[in-house]
């Protein structure tokens, strides 16, 4: 698989707590240069990044991140604010406590409400696989498939574990055909990226593929 094809499916990501505006601009420059799908950045940086890229790159941001236990009303407000500020894509975190309590109807309602708040923008639902049983993951595949969201996503990258090949395969076997898959967290190199894409991932959340592309340019 050509590295350009992999880069085109990467959300070039910087979600570190103390990231600066200068770092976000550099992230955007790299994403534009290497033809990434989007930059995934904190909500507070969306408006500035939108002005900076000036239509040259899609802006993705996160909602209820990273713990997911904000109220639904708070997540809806966050989503509306992000869209107003120029976000093209929204990655939301579900309430994992409600998963453990099997509050399936509440979880579905939350995703539906956030999708409505997206105003037509793309929605990815982060379920934090490292904290779930396979049975819970399968149930969430069903819920996301019914919600109107476009993507199911493996991980925040902050939950103690990232994407695994097993989880991407499980998603592929259990989501509806219209739901795409984003693998995120722990994608360390080009081989990881290629493996996830071959297993059925449509998008990758990582910064390391751009780093790999830079290293290749230098002949490293």
Model-found features: residue ranges?
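Catalytic cores of alpha/beta
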Residues: 50, 70-81, 132-143, 166, ...
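Structural motif
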Residues: 34, 85, 117-118, 143, ...
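Glycine-rich, proline-tolerant flexible connector loops at the mouths of alpha/beta enzymes
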Residues: 28-48, 63-70, 90-108, 155-163
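Alpha-helix-loop-beta-strand connector modules within alpha/beta enzyme cores
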Residues: 43, 47-67, 102-129, 162-189
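Conserved anion-binding
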Residues: 79, 89-150
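Glycine-rich phosphate-binding active-site loops on the catalytic face of alpha/beta enzymes
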Residues: 61, 65, 84-99, 146-162, ...
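Alpha/beta catalytic cores of nucleotide-metabolism and tRNA/nucleoside-modifying enzymes
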Residues: 1-29, 113, 170-180, 187-220
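Active-site mouth loops of central-metabolism enzymes
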Residues: 5-21, 60-76, 97-103, 124-136, ...
């Amino acid at each position: 698989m050509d590295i350009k094809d992999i880069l085109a499916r990467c959300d070039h990501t910087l979600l570190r707590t103390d990231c600066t505006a200068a770092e976000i601009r550099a992230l955007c420059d790299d994403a534009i240069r290497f033809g990434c799908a989007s930059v995934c950045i904190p909500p507070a940086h969306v408006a500035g990044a939108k002005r900076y890229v000036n239509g040259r790159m899609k802006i993705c941001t996160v909602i209820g991140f990273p713990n997911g236990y904000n109220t639904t009303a708070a997540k809806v407000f966050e989503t509306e604010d992000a869209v107003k500020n120029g976000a093209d894509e929204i990655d939301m975190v579900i309430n994992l406590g409600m998963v453990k309590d099997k509050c399936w109807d509440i979880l579905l309602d939350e995703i539906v409400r956030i999708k409505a708040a997206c105003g037509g923008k793309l929605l990815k639902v982060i379920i934090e696989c490292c904290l779930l049983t396979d049975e819970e993951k399968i149930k969430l595949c069903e819920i996301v498939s019914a919600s109107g969201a476009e993507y199911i996503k493996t991980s925040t990258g902050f939950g103690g574990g990232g994407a695994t090949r097993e989880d991407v395969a499980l998603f592929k076997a259990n989501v509806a055909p219209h739901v795409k898959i984003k693998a995120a967290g722990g994608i360390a190199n080009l081989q990881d990226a290629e493996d996830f894409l071959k297993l059925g991932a449509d998008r990758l959340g990582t910064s390391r593929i751009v780093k790999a592309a830079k290293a290749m340019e230098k002949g490293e």
